[in-house]
């Protein structure tokens, strides 16, 4: 398995602000930032922040004491489903297990995806 080595979120945000000061961030999801993406929207190239789907869901579970299903539903409706213009972040599915627990129970891959 290839290791994942990402810059610290504050470094990514600093660089993104230099490239695109209009880029939007998802509140409270800084730990899920994995980089900067270049996207084509509305006839132009834009640099936006890229988040890990699993990282955002894990963050929602920790911050709100939610189970996986609640965090995933909130993410689907209120986060990934919210397009607010060309500077909207993107969310990348890293195809990895969520290593979070809820009340002592490990969240398993089969709880995340249909195989």
Enumerate the language-model features and the residues they cover:
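C-terminal alpha-helical interaction appendages
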Residues: 2-115
């Amino acid at each position: 398995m290839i290791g994942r080595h990402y810059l610290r979120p504050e470094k990514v945000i600093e660089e993104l602000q230099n490239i695109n000061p209009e880029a939007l961030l998802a509140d409270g999801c800084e730990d899920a930032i994995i980089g900067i993406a270049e996207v084509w929207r509305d006839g132009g190239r834009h640099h936006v922040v890229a988040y890990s789907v699993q990282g955002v869901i894990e963050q929602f579970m920790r911050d709100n004491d939610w189970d996986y299903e609640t965090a995933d539903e909130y993410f689907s409706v209120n986060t990934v489903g919210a397009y607010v213009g060309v500077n909207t972040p993107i969310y990348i599915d890293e195809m990895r297990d969520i290593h979070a627990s809820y009340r002592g129970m490990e969240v398993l891959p089969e709880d995340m995806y249909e195989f």
